[in-house]
């Protein structure tokens, strides 16, 4: 009888844990679109997720939707064959992995002095 009770407790514990995980919901990110940029807003700041424009000489905006652009997410400009030069605004402080990967025509990039985090493989 003790084995059976232990098994029932184990099943109940497993069911409880499963219920906990299924009840937790992740808040979906709200994406915004402006001038070829897909971005998110959080805590009064904008993060660029991707760029689908066709500019060859691109000046990334310092403001999107009235909020300062502080981060460029991983692979945001990756595989963009049009980009030849990019100017990043002074508001950018962080760039993710492979932001400019496979941008084979990119010859120059101006980045702000305040940029304190560039992850590995930003250009590869």
Positions of PLM-derived features:
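Intrinsically disordered, low-complexity regions enriched for glutamine and histidine
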Residues: 7-10, 28, 108
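Sec-dependent signal peptide cleavage junction
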Residues: 20-33
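Structural signature of tandem-repeat unit edges
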Residues: 36-44, 53-71, 81-94, 103-119, ...
């Amino acid at each position: 009888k003790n084995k059976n009770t232990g098994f029932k407790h184990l099943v109940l514990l497993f069911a409880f844990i499963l219920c906990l995980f299924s009840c937790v919901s992740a808040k979906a990110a709200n994406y915004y679109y402006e001038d070829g940029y897909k971005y998110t807003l959080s805590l009064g700041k904008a993060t660029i997720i991707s760029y689908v424009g066709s500019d060859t000489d691109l000046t990334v905006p310092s403001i999107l939707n009235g909020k300062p652009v502080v981060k460029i997410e991983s692979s945001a400009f990756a595989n963009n064959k049009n980009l030849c030069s990019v100017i990043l605004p002074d508001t950018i402080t962080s760039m993710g992995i492979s932001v400019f990967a496979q941008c084979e025509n990119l010859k120059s990039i101006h980045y702000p002095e305040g940029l304190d985090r560039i992850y590995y493989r930003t250009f590869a």
